[in-house]
């Protein structure tokens, strides 16, 4: 019951899930539907630093969903589109609403969709850069949340952060559940 009542521990569980999955990971960028978090952990999985951006939807899963709609394609198709870009068209708007308007204008002008998509990925990667640096990411980082499955974003983060994005062997959306199960196991819970 205590485990079920422990609301607000999702980030703790994600951190624990990542640590159980790959103890070498020292930095996490968690990109969910509504916020972006940077989490630095030490060798035993203890949180050293935490940073969060929940003030703007730009840079979140919801933002990617609206961009995919603007491109009239699935989220999976959009996530991979930027990988074929030869150039990047920068997205200058910092607000999700203005960014969507900017993207629609660029599409209307006939700009290459893959280059616009690369600009969107780069824009989000820059927001992730801020969270990762605030949290203290240095050598490598892993991604959790649904956006961790976005290959274009992973490549953009590697480019912006100039560090390796470590792929986890387990679904990155399951890190919270895995961490909660590990927490229950450590506490001797029969959950």
Describe the role of every protein-language-model region.
Residues 1, 38-43, 50-52, 64, ...:
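Short acidic, glycine/serine/threonine-rich loops at helix termini
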């Amino acid at each position: 019951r205590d485990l079920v009542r422990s609301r607000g521990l999702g980030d703790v569980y994600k951190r624990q899930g990542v640590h159980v999955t790959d103890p070498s990971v020292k930095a996490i960028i968690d990109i969910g539907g509504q916020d972006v978090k940077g989490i630095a952990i030490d060798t035993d999985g203890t949180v050293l630093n935490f940073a969060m951006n929940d003030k703007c939807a730009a840079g979140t899963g919801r933002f990617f969903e609206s961009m995919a709609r603007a491109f009239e394609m699935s989220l999976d198709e959009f996530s991979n589109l930027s990988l074929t870009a030869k150039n990047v068209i920068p997205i200058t708007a910092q607000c999700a609403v203005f960014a969507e308007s900017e993207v629609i204008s660029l599409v209307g002008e006939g700009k290459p969709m893959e280059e616009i998509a690369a600009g969107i990925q780069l824009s989000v990667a820059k927001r992730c850069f801020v969270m990762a640096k605030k949290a203290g990411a240095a050598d490598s980082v892993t991604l959790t949340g649904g956006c961790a499955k976005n290959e274009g974003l992973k490549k953009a983060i590697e480019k912006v952060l100039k560090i390796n994005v470590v792929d986890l062997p387990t679904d990155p959306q399951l890190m919270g559940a895995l961490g909660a199960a590990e927490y229950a196991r450590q506490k001797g819970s029969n959950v």
